[in-house]
């Protein structure tokens, strides 16, 4: 990255909770799309969060609020209807290695992406708009959303919001990496800086596989 590099570096240098992975992801996209403005990026997120809040209010008959226990699952199911059915977000199985799957503006415009970009978007809107306490979770070969309060259930955003138990995650991981001997420790909460670093690595690997070395170096 060169364009917007100074702003990106300043953002990465921010301490702890001040670092915003959504903002960083949009800066990565702005490097690819110089005409993409920060104002448009912010507007896109604000509009979706507002719609998510209204959606939860209309379904629950009250303002969106933080839920606990079984009510969280019901809230996730309600939010999933908006995210996957109304908005039409889905995993891009057909063009998994298309670089556009890693640019957040493209993910929003095209309604498709890869596990990490879809989950980043899902978690941010769920937390900021639908008031659902979900977190990003890494596992071997895949990326999920999970819950702060429990480690036995996960959300496969790439898989249209399907709930996965820990044994199902183990089966999925071992199907992706046959030599893997799965352990519960393979499921881990992913910090915001790690998410952005993984998104950049994905782009670099895609460009290397395409033998687009100038792009790989630029990223």
Kindly label every feature range from the protein language model.
Residues 1-219:
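A structural boundary/capping signal
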């Amino acid at each position: 990255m060169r364009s917007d590099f100074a702003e990106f570096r300043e953002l990465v240098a921010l301490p702890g909770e001040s670092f915003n992975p959504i903002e960083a992801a949009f800066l990565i996209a702005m490097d690819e799309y110089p005409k993409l403005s920060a104002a448009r990026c912010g507007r896109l997120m604000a509009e979706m969060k507002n719609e998510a809040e209204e959606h939860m209010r209309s379904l629950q008959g009250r303002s969106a609020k933080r839920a606990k226990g079984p009510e969280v699952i019901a809230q996730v199911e309600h939010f999933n209807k908006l995210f996957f059915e109304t908005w039409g977000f889905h995993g891009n199985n057909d063009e998994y290695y298309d670089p556009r799957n890693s640019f957040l503006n493209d993910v929003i415009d095209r309604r498709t992406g890869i596990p990490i970009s879809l989950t980043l978007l899902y978690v941010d809107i769920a937390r900021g708009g639908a008031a659902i306490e979900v977190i990003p979770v890494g596992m071997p070969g895949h990326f999920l959303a999970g819950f702060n309060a429990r480690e036995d259930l996960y959300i496969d955003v790439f898989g249209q919001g399907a709930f996965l138990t820990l044994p199902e995650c183990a089966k999925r991981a071992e199907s992706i990496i046959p030599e893997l001997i799965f352990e519960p420790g393979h499921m881990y909460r992913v910090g915001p800086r790690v998410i952005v670093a993984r998104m950049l690595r994905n782009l670099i690997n895609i460009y290397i596989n395409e033998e687009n070395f100038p792009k790989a170096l630029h990223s």
